[in-house]
Amino acid sequence: MSNTAPGPTVANKRDEKHRHVVNVVLELPTEISEATHPVLATMLSKYTRMSSLFNDKCAFKLDLLRMIAVSRTRR
């Protein structure tokens, strides 16, 4: 048997960061994080990678709103 203790996988860490961005940084309901809107999926992925820059939560909220607005006006 192996002596290594099972640790969190990369996918679990990524999911944990994703939930942190949705719930703490953007203050969105959990249901929204499961949405399949392409802009939301793209921006959440971007924000998850930028986890060290969460000093100004309002900037992330405004950026997300701006990106959603831009995506709707281009149609």
Swiss-Prot record:
InterPro entries for this protein: HV_small_capsid
Record GO biological process: viral process
Pfam families assigned to the protein according to its UniProt record, in alphabetical order: HV_small_capsid (PF17086)
Statement: the UniProt record of this protein carries the keyword Phosphoprotein: no
Superkingdom of origin: Viruses
Claim: Metal-binding is one of the keywords in the record: no
Keyword terms of this UniProt record: Capsid protein, Host nucleus, Virion
Gene Ontology CC terms, in alphabetical order: host cell nucleus; viral capsid
Localization of this protein: Virion; Host nucleus
Assembly mode: Interacts with the major capsid protein/MCP.
Stated role: Participates in the assembly of the infectious particles by decorating the outer surface of the capsid shell and thus forming a layer between the capsid and the tegument. Complexes composed of the capsid protein VP5 and UL48A assemble together in the host cytoplasm and are translocated to the nucleus, where they accumulate and participate in capsid assembly.
Family from the record: Belongs to the herpesviridae small capsomere-interacting protein family.
Protein name per the record: Small capsomere-interacting protein
